[in-house]
């Protein structure tokens, strides 16, 4: 394992144990901050953020995560830097890797972020591509961990993704199957996960004990579901059909409404990556309900960013994956550091 450079471009390059470690790390840092202590785990570190597409949650959560933990973020807007234009992606990545400590990129094509990761000598985080959305994945699995049904583990749970096979749908399948969950896409033919991508989820499930199902049958999809997830019906990168044509395909069968939710378990939770088009893929009644966890989900984008940045920029955390003794030692030292710092801050107050 390369202890000096690790990217977060595709969660399929991580083990279940590594993902679980990041889940626990994110929750631990979140609890520390709620107790009033901001551990300076990213002190003097600088994140460069490349955005080829607009962003609300990703940009703000990344900037806030860096600031809260003692670091700094720079926004690199389209047109303000060379990236595959006058200067090659390779050259730009080499330069940024010499100046920055970590790079985040939201790109139109997955190839771009993969190339940045290949040539930059610092960690690179995929802030979303036309293929996947791994930071959303981690935030979502943290949210599900915080809202597990009583007596259940992640590996006992079933999640249903409703609608189009967007990059968020694909990412949900990747993460769910990695963690041993049962994943279902409830969507129309022509908008289901592509076979070559589906194979990755099936392989994950084979290893973890989870499952993957693609169906157009609502009763089959929602039976015993613990989580329901949806996304917009027209993705950032798809222009084959007009919004009107897509509405004809998806509405009303694939709208998450009270009637559809009633088919799931009585403890089901609703999720949406946002922004939501209310009245289309989800009704106001559902998104504003007491079983909706979309706002916790949005907040946990920052929880995920903290965990990812700290994990990538602290090699000792990656070493902990190779040795349970090192992991236990680091966990003990980290917990002690947080307790002492909180006590010191309270005494100062």
Swiss-Prot record:
<feature type="site" description="Important for structural integrity">
    <location>
        <position position="146"/>
    </location>
</feature>
<dbReference type="GO" id="GO:0019240">
    <property type="term" value="P:citrulline biosynthetic process"/>
</dbReference>
<dbReference type="Pfam" id="PF00185">
    <property type="entry name" value="OTCace"/>
</dbReference>
<protein>
    <recommendedName>
        <fullName>Putrescine carbamoyltransferase</fullName>
        <ecNumber>2.1.3.6</ecNumber>
    </recommendedName>
</protein>
<dbReference type="GO" id="GO:0042450">
    <property type="term" value="P:arginine biosynthetic process via ornithine"/>
</dbReference>
<feature type="binding site">
    <location>
        <position position="133"/>
    </location>
    <ligand>
        <name>carbamoyl phosphate</name>
    </ligand>
</feature>
<dbReference type="InterPro" id="IPR036901">
    <property type="entry name" value="Asp/Orn_carbamoylTrfase_sf"/>
</dbReference>
<keyword id="KW-0620">Polyamine biosynthesis</keyword>
<comment type="pathway">
    <text>Amine and polyamine biosynthesis; putrescine biosynthesis via agmatine pathway; putrescine from N-carbamoylputrescine (transferase route): step 1/1.</text>
</comment>
<dbReference type="InterPro" id="IPR006131">
    <property type="entry name" value="Asp_carbamoyltransf_Asp/Orn-bd"/>
</dbReference>
<dbReference type="Pfam" id="PF02729">
    <property type="entry name" value="OTCace_N"/>
</dbReference>
<comment type="subunit">
    <text>Homotrimer.</text>
</comment>
<dbReference type="GO" id="GO:0050231">
    <property type="term" value="F:putrescine carbamoyltransferase activity"/>
</dbReference>
<dbReference type="InterPro" id="IPR006130">
    <property type="entry name" value="Asp/Orn_carbamoylTrfase"/>
</dbReference>
<keyword id="KW-0808">Transferase</keyword>
<dbReference type="InterPro" id="IPR002292">
    <property type="entry name" value="Orn/put_carbamltrans"/>
</dbReference>
<feature type="binding site">
    <location>
        <begin position="55"/>
        <end position="59"/>
    </location>
    <ligand>
        <name>carbamoyl phosphate</name>
    </ligand>
</feature>
<dbReference type="GO" id="GO:0016597">
    <property type="term" value="F:amino acid binding"/>
</dbReference>
<dbReference type="InterPro" id="IPR006132">
    <property type="entry name" value="Asp/Orn_carbamoyltranf_P-bd"/>
</dbReference>
<dbReference type="GO" id="GO:0033390">
    <property type="term" value="P:putrescine biosynthetic process from arginine via N-carbamoylputrescine"/>
</dbReference>
<feature type="site" description="Important for structural integrity">
    <location>
        <position position="30"/>
    </location>
</feature>
<dbReference type="GO" id="GO:0004585">
    <property type="term" value="F:ornithine carbamoyltransferase activity"/>
</dbReference>
<comment type="similarity">
    <text>Belongs to the aspartate/ornithine carbamoyltransferase superfamily. PTCase family.</text>
</comment>
<feature type="binding site">
    <location>
        <begin position="272"/>
        <end position="275"/>
    </location>
    <ligand>
        <name>putrescine</name>
    </ligand>
</feature>
<keyword id="KW-0963">Cytoplasm</keyword>
<dbReference type="GO" id="GO:0005737">
    <property type="term" value="C:cytoplasm"/>
</dbReference>
<comment type="function">
    <text>Catalyzes the phosphorolysis of N-carbamoylputrescine to form carbamoyl phosphate and putrescine. Is involved in the degradation pathway of the polyamine agmatine.</text>
</comment>
<feature type="binding site">
    <location>
        <position position="106"/>
    </location>
    <ligand>
        <name>carbamoyl phosphate</name>
    </ligand>
</feature>
<dbReference type="InterPro" id="IPR024903">
    <property type="entry name" value="PtcA"/>
</dbReference>
